Amino acid sequence: MAAALQLPMVEGDDFHPPANVARMREGIALTDADRVGWLAQLADVLQQHPAGAVLGCSALKRAYRDSLRNAVPGLRFVYLHITPAESLRRVAERPGHFYPPSLVTSQFEALQDPSGEPGVLTLDGTAPLDQVAARAAEWIKALQLATCPRPTASP
């Protein structure tokens, strides 16, 4: 998606503070308080890219998404809908990552489905990656066209 939009890709996991990473490695789910600084860092990173960026992050709760929306006007979200079982399978295939499969259930318990919120596109997260990326990029491009001022012809 980032490549299709010619935008930088930002991986949200790279911005977790060491204390959060340690908690997750130990199988301890993050609290809202644990995420405050992380969300602020993500907002800062997005603000450093005024032309746009693609951010990959969980943004599980509406409050987290609203925090990012308030910091970055015009922010849009692509929600990849998958089942807990599919998520567990994918996490298990990431050996060496600090996020253990044991935390998948807690993420789904915390998840507030963003479908229906303004500025959210919900896609089937089990569809082929190239199709998901293309659909998301098409949506963003259409939004950009809809919000860009169009030149008017001179008489």
Say what each PLM segment does.
Residues 16, 60-61, 82-87, 128:
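Conserved nucleotide-binding/hydrolysis micro-motifs of P-loop NTPases
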Residues 9, 14, 77-79, 120-122:
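Conserved beta-strand scaffold positions in the cores of enzyme catalytic domains, especially
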